[in-house]
Amino acid sequence: NETVRRFLPMVDFLEQILGKNSEIVLHDFSDPDHAIVDIRNGIVSGRKVGGPATDLALKIMHDAKYRDLPFITGYEGRGAGGKTLESATYFIREDKEIVGMLCVNTDLSTVRSINARHSLFDAAPTRTEPAPIEVESLSESTQELIDRSIAELLSARGLDVASLGQSDRVDVIRHLNGNGVFMLKGAVACAATALGISEPSVYRYLQKVRKEG
């Protein structure tokens, strides 16, 4: 997408300003499976060019409530090895449609001095509303994204995969569908693997969920 590519110089610009502890990522929504078109300091999250869209990116593509927001700041990201990141995202638009994102994810765990801790994120006194999600998972693959999403959902409900009944599995598929996960190629197979069920079962549950509207 040419509109997204116009932001390529901003990736270099932000890298020079923010330094090695901040990952800068440019996403193009025209190909969610390979949404990352440029990245600097990818070691922060373990990602690289050609990586898939995050759970937050999928939610933004899927959820109309983000259409009027220019950006979101002050939310938590989860990077490589489970490290906690301070994150911010600027939405790239064509007319009113969000076609990409420019994201900054800062690893505060490596900051040594008190002065260095006062990053540009400190300028935002509150999190942008509406809050996107509790934590954005910066996953390297579709399987990892789905595994994390399911694990977090089940943990919150005090469940595990082995104990799930059919209605529970339908709820999991409903959750994934609501977050736009099935926009990713191969997501059905990944969900089947994560839940220990067949792909036809996932398709059946997905059809049921989508019929519900």
Q: PLM ranges: what are they?
A:
Residues 1-8, 15-17, 100-101, 106-166:
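Juxtadomain coupling helices with adjacent low-complexity linkers
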Residues 37, 90, 180:
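Flexible, active-site-adjacent loop/turn segments at secondary-structure boundaries
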Residues 60-121:
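Sensory/regulatory domains in signal-transduction proteins
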Residues 19, 155-158, 196, 211:
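Residue-level recognition of short, structured coil/turn motifs
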